[in-house]
């Protein structure tokens, strides 16, 4: 009888593991292949060879790139090279990417930038918020952008127990932000287990010098985050659930879920066109190819444009798709004056004139 019970439990356990494995492949879109949707006036950006995971653009056309991300389980073309922040002036006739100097005293050797966000204060001071993973830990760095010197002055490093696995950040004040945790745990094995079992424990946290609190939870893997031009709504990409969540910002900075937009792809970072409110999304058509890198079958890239997301029938347009022959692993797409920038997790970046 005891052996029968043991065999029954073993069978149930194996069946559960098998079901979870198949479910994970579905969440990763592991069987998806794509056909290219090209744009005519595009070129690869010189000087970006190891990824531009996130991009943020100021109203004056200065674009910031976080480059050189190293992440457990992800391929890297330069595993020993520190990351950095690059800048490109999109108002120039032939814009080029330049690396920004960082103030003395900041640990550049372990700089591993991930999601970024800018904030302009009432006195026109520009702050750059950077999710950083020094030695695969989790911090948010706040810099002051010094345009005359093309440099960043490091102001503050933020660590908190509610920020165990930070992915992206949207600044809402000089020391205030919302951040996504793509996992509940910080330990790599527990992260893997959390993903495999689809526990949906990822969340969004609000940080200010006065308080830090959980404001939204129940995500499979909360990834990109951004805010509407009128500052009333926060958008969160749930990458493994293929969803964008629309959350209404409350006076106390809590978030209330308003709606969920289902998409058939892995949605990464979200960028907002300030003039129209359109959401531009860098996507991964096949997530398995990101983690099992094969140069003969590289990860593909996809850019979506979402219009009128607050309406009953938002418009979703596929702007660009590439099978990896040009661009591998697109993580962000952002627009400025009909100029489109597309960044990737660990490869190149694309500049297009629409």
From Swiss-Prot:
It is found in: Membrane. It catalyses: a phenyl acetate + H2O = a phenol + acetate + H(+); an N-acyl-L-homoserine lactone + H2O = an N-acyl-L-homoserine + H(+). Disulfide bonds join 42-352. The gene is Pon2. InterPro entries: 6-blade_b-propeller_TolB-like, Arylesterase, Paraoxonase2, Serum_paraoxonase/arylesterase. Homotrimer. The keyword Hydrolase applies. Its EC number is 3.1.1.2, 3.1.1.81. Belongs to the paraoxonase family. SUPFAM superfamilies: Calcium-dependent phosphotriesterase (SSF63829). Pfam families: Arylesterase. Its cofactor is Ca(2+). One of its GO terms (biological process) is response to oxidative stress. Gene3D superfamilies: TolB, C-terminal domain. Glycans are attached at residues 254, 269, 323. Ca(2+) 1 binds at residues 53, 167, 223, 268-269. Keywords: Calcium, Disulfide bond, Glycoprotein, Hydrolase, Membrane, Metal-binding, Signal. Glycosylated. The signal sequence is not cleaved. GO terms for cellular component: extracellular region; plasma membrane. It comes from the Eukaryota. Ca(2+) 2 binds at residues 54, 116, 168. GO terms for molecular function: acyl-L-homoserine-lactone lactonohydrolase activity; arylesterase activity; metal ion binding; protein homodimerization activity. Its main location: membrane. Binds 2 calcium ions per subunit. Capable of hydrolyzing lactones and a number of aromatic carboxylic acid esters. This is Serum paraoxonase/arylesterase 2.
């Amino acid at each position: 009888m005891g052996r029968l019970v043991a065999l029954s439990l073993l069978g149930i356990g194996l069946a559960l593991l098998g079901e979870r494995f198949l479910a994970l492949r579905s969440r990763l879109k592991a069987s998806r292949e794509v056909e290219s949707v090209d744009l005519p006036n595009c070129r690869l950006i010189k000087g970006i060879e190891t990824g531009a995971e996130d991009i943020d653009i100021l109203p004056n056309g200065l674009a910031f790139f976080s480059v050189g991300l190293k992440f457990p389980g992800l391929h890297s073309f330069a595993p020993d090279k520190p990351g950095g922040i690059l800048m490109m002036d999109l108002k120039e006739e032939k814009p080029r990417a330049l690396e920004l100097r960082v103030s003395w005293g900041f640990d550049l050797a372990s700089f591993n930038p991930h999601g970024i966000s800018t904030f302009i204060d009432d006195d026109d001071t520009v702050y750059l918020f950077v999710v950083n993973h020094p030695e695969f830990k989790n911090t948010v760095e706040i810099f002051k952008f010094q345009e005359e010197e093309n440099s960043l002055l490091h102001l503050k490093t933020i660590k908190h127990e509610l920020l165990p696995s930070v992915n992206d950040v949207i600044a809402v004040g000089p020391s205030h932000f919302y951040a996504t945790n793509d996992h509940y745990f910080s330990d790599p094995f527990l992260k893997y287990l959390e993903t495999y079992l689809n526990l949906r424990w990822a969340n969004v946290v609000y940080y200010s010098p006065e308080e830090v609190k959980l404001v939204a939870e129940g995500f499979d893997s909360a990834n990109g985050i951004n805010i509407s031009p009128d500052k009333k709504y926060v958008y969160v990409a749930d990458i493994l659930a293929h969803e964008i969540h629309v959350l209404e910002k409350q006076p106390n900075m809590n978030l209330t879920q308003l709606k969920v937009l289902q998409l058939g792809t892995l949605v990464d970072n979200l960028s907002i066109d300030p003039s129209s409110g359109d959401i531009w999304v860098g996507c991964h058509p096949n997530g398995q190819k990101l983690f099992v890198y094969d140069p003969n079958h590289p990860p593909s890239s996809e850019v979506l444009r979402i219009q009128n997301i607050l309406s009953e029938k938002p418009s979703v347009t596929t702007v660009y798709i590439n099978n990896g022959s040009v661009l591998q692993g697109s993580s962000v797409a952002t627009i400025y004056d009909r100029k489109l920038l597309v960044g990737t997790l660990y490869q190149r970046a694309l500049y297009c004139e629409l």
